[in-house]
Amino acid sequence: MNNENTKVYIRVSGKRPEGFIDPKPFEWGFKRDKILWTRISKMESLEDMDWKELCQDLGAPESFLKKRSYMLFQKHLKLLSEQMSDSPRMRSPLDTRNSVDETILQNLQASKILNNRFDVPNNETLDTTTNKNNEESGSDLSSSLSVSKSALEDALMDRLQL
């Protein structure tokens, strides 16, 4: 169905009321939808919206703009809902901090400060072990060294001279 060559006629039973004026035809498209959404999404409250001015700017009747606004809000809320349901769970600030801590620890493990690799269990101490042959790796660290997160942070601060 093409907007340019399709006309719809609606027959309403009864007489036209006195003073009835046919609404002016108008064109609506994505560009105007975007303008409408930009205007309505920024308003603080319903009283802030000047519908008459918006009607003049967009060249559409007030009733159409209100219905279209409702549809746009509904569409954006649905998209937001889908985004929230797609993510497994919302991240709390604690989760974010823990992931940052783990990233810092992993970076420390790969840095020159610590030559050995560590397995990082959740919020526990880090144990390093030498290879299976108990060969000296050239490091001062012994095979059963246990390092806490705060010790790693202190080592980093010393290294960075902070």
Swiss-Prot record:
Compartments, as annotated in UniProt: Preautophagosomal structure
Residue ranges of the region described as Disordered: 119-145
Descriptive protein name: Autophagy-related protein 29
Statement: the UniProt record of this protein carries the keyword Transport: yes
Role: Plays a role in autophagy. Functions at the preautophagosomal structure (PAS) in order to form normal autophagosomes under starvation conditions. Also plays a role in mitophagy.
Example GO BP: protein transport
UniProt similarity note: Belongs to the ATG29 family.
Consequence of gene disruption: Mislocalizes ATG8 in the cytosol, when ATG11 is also deleted.
Quaternary state and interactors: Forms a stable complex with ATG17 and ATG31. Interacts directly with ATG31. The ATG17-ATG29-ATG31 complex interacts with the ATG1-ATG13 complex. Note=The interaction with the ATG1-ATG13 complex is induced by starvation.
Keywords of this entry: Autophagy, Protein transport, Transport
Miscellaneous comment: Kluyveromyces marxianus proteins are shorter in length and have a more ordered secondary structure than their S.cerevisiae counterparts, which might contribute to the superior thermotolerance and solubility. K.marxianus could be therefore useful as a new model organism for further elucidation of the molecular details of autophagy.
Biased composition (Polar residues): 122-132
GO CC annotations on file: phagophore assembly site
InterPro entries the UniProt entry points to: ATG29 (IPR039113), Atg29_N (IPR040666), ATG29_sf (IPR039362)
Endpoints of the signal sequence: none
